[in-house]
């Protein structure tokens, strides 16, 4: 959520920056109308309440003096009715203003490339050499099915499309990657491990920006009004909702493994085979709470931490600086890390690393004090995938495949695979 005072005094500037996102600003124009009316109602209501108090005191004086107070009593009733009407209108205006504020996306950072679509994203850097195969490489779903380590067909029978059973060495590889990533981020990068709940309430989804705008993309448990988490970002960020932290606690860095659940409502017909787009998948998420002046340095560190996973796995990748039209709703700046997938003949996203500045913290009321008695300020929050496990499995299967259909296990994972070197 944006700062309402900043928006009030910089309305045209904010509007111009949001236009770079390609947003429909039809409703945005109502801000000035609602904000002005709200302030008018606050003034009018306070004036009437003050008058009501004065009249009430006058009535008390007249009654003590045994004088007729009927006219003032009638006047106070009329004032009371007006106060009630103004309070009702104020409540409606504030609810409308709150809904509008929750629907306004974050302001892009000045360093984000200006553009409309993914075609305008900018390559920040690449790492590793794309392997030249001496044979026609197979897609990971064919490799895994032939090896008996992934079963899409039976998962479709048990649940439906976009689900999978991991079996044997496939399940072991998934588990190995989870342990490897958590060990790397906690032992070498300084994150604290968290295992979060997989269901959250509506306030949590609102705090991180999934609600109210993207409710159709979420899996909701209607009987409880809980939501299955689309990412560990939601529960982990909301750990500190409605809290005031001390300066000495910052930065806070969490690494959280979780399963993630997404409806993929807008992805019909895309990536219908394999692990790239599943309704349920595992991920290691990195979440940070930092002082505002440190957040862009921390974004670079977070992105480097996610990149390190791919470097140790020796998987070629590139880092994209996302343009203003492809930032998503909550990010002020975002990098996508894309890993090379041979069957696609291109790079595919495996991590998004974002700085939300105070956008989430304002929604979730997460603040800190620089001094013990100082005025609370909003922290800046960041998060990034470190990494998506299923897509990492897909990248390993395809990049490490051999002509006979076997898979070489990356050296860094072998201790987690019982010393095994090949999946066959």
From Swiss-Prot:
L-serine binds at residues 231-233, 285, 385. Pfam families: Seryl_tRNA_N, tRNA-synt_2b. It is an enzyme of class 6 (ligase). It comes from the Bacteria. Keywords: Aminoacyl-tRNA synthetase, ATP-binding, Cytoplasm, Ligase, Nucleotide-binding, Protein biosynthesis. It is found in: Cytoplasm. One of its GO terms (cellular component) is cytoplasm. The keyword Chloroplast does not apply. Its EC number is 6.1.1.11. GO terms for biological process: selenocysteine biosynthetic process; seryl-tRNA aminoacylation. Transmembrane segments: none annotated. InterPro entries: aa-tRNA-synt_IIb (IPR002314), aa-tRNA-synth_II (IPR006195), aa-tRNA-synth_II/BPL/LPL (IPR045864), Ser-tRNA-ligase_type_1 (IPR002317), Ser-tRNA-synth_1_N (IPR015866), SerRS_1_N_sf (IPR042103), SerRS_core (IPR033729), tRNA-bd_arm (IPR010978). It catalyses: tRNA(Ser) + L-serine + ATP = L-seryl-tRNA(Ser) + AMP + diphosphate + H(+); tRNA(Sec) + L-serine + ATP = L-seryl-tRNA(Sec) + AMP + diphosphate + H(+). Catalyzes the attachment of serine to tRNA(Ser). Is also able to aminoacylate tRNA(Sec) with serine, to form the misacylated tRNA L-seryl-tRNA(Sec), which will be further converted into selenocysteinyl-tRNA(Sec). Homodimer. The tRNA molecule binds across the dimer. PANTHER family: SERINE--TRNA LIGASE, SERYL-TRNA SYNTHETASE. This is Serine--tRNA ligase. The lineage of its organism: Bacteria, Bacillati, Bacillota, Bacilli, Bacillales.
């Amino acid at each position: 959520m944006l700062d309402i005072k900043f928006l009030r005094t910089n309305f045209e500037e904010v509007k111009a920056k949001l236009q770079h996102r390609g947003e429909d600003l039809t409703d945005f124009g109502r801000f000035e109308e609602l904000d002005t009316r709200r302030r008018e109602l606050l003034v009018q209501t306070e004036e009437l309440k003050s008058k009501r108090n004065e009249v009430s005191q006058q009535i008390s004086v007249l009654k003590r003096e045994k004088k007729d107070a009927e006219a003032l009593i009638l006047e106070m009733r009329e004032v009371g009715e007006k106060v009630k009407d103004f309070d009702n209108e104020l409540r409606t205006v504030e609810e409308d203003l709150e809904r509008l504020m929750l629907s306004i996306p974050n302001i892009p950072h000045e360093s984000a490339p200006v553009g409309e679509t993914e075609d305008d994203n900018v390559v920040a850097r690449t790492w590793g050499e794309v392997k030249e195969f001496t044979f026609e490489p197979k897609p990971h779903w064919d490799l895994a099915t032939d090896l008996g380590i992934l079963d899409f067909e039976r998962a479709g029978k048990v649940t439906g499309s976009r689900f999978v059973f991991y079996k044997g060495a496939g399940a072991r590889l998934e588990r190995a990657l989870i342990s490897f990533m958590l060990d790397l981020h906690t032992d070498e990068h300084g994150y604290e491990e968290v295992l979060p709940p997989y269901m959250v309430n509506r306030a949590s989804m609102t705090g991180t920006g999934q609600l109210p705008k993207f409710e159709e993309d979420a899996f909701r448990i209607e009987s409880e009004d809980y939501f299955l988490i689309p990412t560990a970002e939601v529960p982990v960020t909301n750990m500190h909702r409605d809290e005031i932290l001390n300066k000495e606690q910052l930065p806070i860095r969490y690494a959280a493994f979780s399963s993630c659940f997404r409806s993929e409502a807008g992805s019909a017909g895309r990536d219908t085979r394999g692990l790239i787009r599943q309704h349920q998948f595992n991920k290691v998420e990195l979440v940070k709470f930092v002082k505002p002046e440190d957040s862009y340095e921390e974004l670079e560190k977070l992105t480097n931490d996610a990149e390190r996973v791919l470097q140790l796995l020796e998987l070629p990748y590139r880092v994209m600086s996302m343009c203003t039209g492809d930032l998503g709703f909550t990010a002020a700046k975002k990098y996508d890390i894309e890993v090379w997938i041979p069957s696609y003949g291109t790079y595919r996203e495996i991590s998004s690393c974002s700085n939300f500045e105070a956008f989430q913290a304002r929604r979730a009321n997460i603040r800190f004090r620089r001094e013990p008695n100082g005025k609370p300020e909003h922290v800046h929050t960041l998060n990034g995938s470190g990494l998506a496990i299923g897509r990492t499995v897909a990248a390993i299967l395809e990049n490490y495949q051999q002509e006979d259909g076997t898979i070489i296990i990356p050296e860094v994972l072998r201790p987690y695979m019982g010393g095994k070197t090949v999946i066959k």
